[in-house]
């Protein structure tokens, strides 16, 4: 508590600031790879807590959905009996400190009280968060602060318990709220406690919350902290007592120690930085993207990153191809510990992928389009992507080979990597059909361009399958295993459709329709299945105008990269900016999936 300082946003390349309280607002979460905390603009408001890879059904007999956690950080602050809300504040300002992973707010309430507070998800404690508050009285005031837990509606039977801890120099009033998820009866527990620099009496309010009061004279400063932890049965047999222990441990460590460890670990993460000279906008955008990736993952977790990270329940928190094709590569270069966890997520779920292939009449491993914690298909049944978007298995195998190429961990390749690649290769061989001319087709798929359903010989699906089969053969040789002849035969024989002028045809029968996102253009990069510059340029010129203007931003990023590789810096920059600027949301620049 005594270590609290409000860091001013003087470094515009690391800090993102807003001061218009009435502007449209899309919040930015703080996360530590275990929990995500989403602060909002109203004083002391936290919109939701997201728990990494903790799932319940979205509705009876529906697919799994990432759950919101019980929020132990809810505070009701009053000054002279009036609730501190957005109606009587001035000088409001929020700042996201990317380097420190802090969400800061400050304002003046009713010309009586200066308020500043930090919110962080503690990097050193993956199930815990900390709110640090500092106030200064501009006039004599009576301050009261009440803490309780907010229980989202996806829970049943919430139970509140209070406990006093007075031992080893600790004087804590723990407030624990536990409940069961509505459909799968998973227990979640959240515990919180106030921490003070000096003795301050905490009492029980009429509604079973913790509350303290403080009289402040003009000019008097006062600081306190609120430490909270959220645990679930996914990670603990006894989440109730564990959430208590986390808070007790953190309180005994002390706020200064917790923050030192938090900042130390974020400094280590930022050794994996991308530095851009001469373009402040691009520098902030790239660091903001890295911040979200680092906030959503951690080394050693054996977990991956969903499309919305730990900010929301978007796409139900499932794991898609986005992970291996778009999020994994920067982690592979910048933080191999996180990249390894993303690989562990897939190798840990090889068995259900094999069971899925078996259930559809194939050999090997058929990974789900949308994977939840157990690794089974979790795509809603109204979408054909679940049964038919089969390039996901090849994407995972390609990422597996890339991890080996970067890490050169031959033991991992033998024990974990190659077994996955082998099973994917067997699936792809069993999925391919031989034509009369000896070539091979993969029929009836959903393309990477998901507007195209039930088509044959999708260029990206077939090229990804070819790469996965070729990589599996290389891995087999390194492991001292002779690859089946069928792997090479199918890889060589897979059809890649072409127009008469040499442009890659997205699928057999494609005739220039609008596409959702890049598909055939991915053959040049990252698949590197097309290497001649004139062929790459033909595909770029043909497909860029075909991309739906409201489609995902990922298309323009990969087109920009290809133009850069061709040496066309001006066009590369145009598309690079287009990949994020139209998708930025106020006030911090959070990226939406679609433009506008």
Question: What function would you assign to each model-found segment?
Answer:
Residues 288-295, 345-352, 419-431, 467, ...:
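Alpha-helical scaffold segments in carbohydrate-active enzymes
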Residues 268, 272-273, 277, 281-296, ...:
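Long, charged, mostly alpha-helical binding arms that flank functional sites
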Residues 423, 427-481:
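Acidic/histidine-rich catalytic neighborhood
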Residues 297-311, 337-398, 404, 408-415, ...:
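Helix-terminus loop motifs that line ligand-binding clefts
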């Amino acid at each position: 508590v005594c270590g609290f300082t409000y860091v001013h946003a003087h470094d515009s390349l690391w800090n993102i600031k807003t001061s218009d309280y009435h502007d449209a607002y899309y919040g930015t979460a703080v996360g530590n790879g275990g929990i995500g905390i989403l602060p909002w603009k109203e004083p002391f408001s936290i919109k939701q807590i997201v728990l990494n890879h903790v799932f319940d059904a979205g509705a009876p007999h529906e697919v799994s959905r990432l759950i919101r956690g019980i929020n132990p950080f809810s505070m009701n602050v009053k000054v002279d009996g009036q609730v501190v809300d957005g109606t009587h504040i001035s000088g409001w300002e929020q700042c996201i400190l990317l380097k420190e992973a802090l969400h800061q707010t400050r304002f003046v309430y009713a010309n009586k009280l200066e308020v500043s507070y930090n919110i962080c998800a503690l990097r050193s404690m993956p199930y815990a968060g900390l709110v640090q508050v500092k106030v200064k009285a501009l006039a004599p005031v009576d301050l009261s602060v009440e803490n309780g837990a907010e229980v989202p509606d996806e829970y049943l039977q919430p139970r509140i318990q209070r406990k006093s801890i007075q031992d080893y120099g600790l004087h804590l009033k723990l407030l624990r709220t536990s409940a069961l998820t509505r459909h799968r009866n998973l227990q979640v527990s959240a515990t919180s406690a106030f921490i003070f620099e000096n003795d301050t009496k905490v009492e029980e309010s009429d509604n079973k919350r913790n509350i303290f009061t403080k009289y402040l004279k003009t000019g008097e400063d006062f600081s306190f902290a609120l430490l909270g932890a959220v645990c679930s049965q996914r990670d603990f047999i006894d989440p109730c007592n564990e959430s208590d222990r986390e808070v007790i441990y953190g309180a005994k460590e002390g706020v200064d120690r917790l923050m030192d460890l938090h900042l130390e670990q974020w400094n280590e993460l930022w050794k994996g930085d991308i530095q851009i000279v001469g373009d402040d906008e691009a520098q902030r955008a790239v660091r903001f993207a890295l911040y979200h990736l680092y906030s959503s993952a951690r080394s050693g977790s054996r977990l991956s990153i969903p499309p919305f990270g730990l900010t929301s329940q978007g796409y139900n928190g499932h794991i898609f191809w986005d992970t291996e094709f778009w999020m994994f590569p920067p982690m592979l270069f910048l933080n191999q510990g996180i990249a390894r966890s993303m690989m562990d997520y897939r190798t840990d779920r090889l068995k259900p992928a094999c069971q899925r292939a078996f259930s559809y009449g194939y050999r090997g491993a058929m990974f789900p389009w949308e994977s939840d914690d157990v690794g089974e298909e979790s795509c809603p049944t109204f979408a054909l992507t679940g049964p038919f978007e089969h390039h996901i298995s090849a994407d995972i195998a390609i990422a597996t080979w890339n991890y080996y190429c970067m890490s050169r961990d031959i033991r991992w390749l033998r024990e974990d990597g190659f077994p996955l690649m082998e099973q994917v290769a067997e699936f792809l061989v069993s999925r391919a059909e031989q034509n009369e001319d000896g070539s091979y087709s993969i029929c009836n798929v959903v393309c990477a361009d998901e507007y195209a359903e039930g088509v044959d010989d999708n260029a990206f699906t077939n090229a990804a399958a070819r790469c996965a089969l070729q990589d599996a053969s290389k891995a087999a040789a390194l492991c001292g295993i002779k690859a089946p002849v069928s792997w090479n035969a199918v890889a060589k024989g897979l059809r890649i459709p072409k127009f008469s002028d040499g442009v890659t045809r997205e699928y057999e029968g494609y005739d220039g329709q609008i596409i959702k996102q890049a598909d055939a253009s991915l053959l040049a990069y990252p698949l590197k299945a097309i290497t001649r510059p004139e062929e790459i340029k033909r595909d770029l010129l043909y497909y860029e105008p075909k991309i739906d203007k409201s489609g995902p931003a990922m298309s323009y990023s990969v087109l920009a990269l290809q133009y850069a590789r061709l040496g066309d810096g001006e066009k590369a920059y145009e598309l690079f900016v287009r990949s994020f600027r139209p998708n930025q949301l106020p006030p911090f620049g959070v990226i939406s999936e679609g433009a506008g």
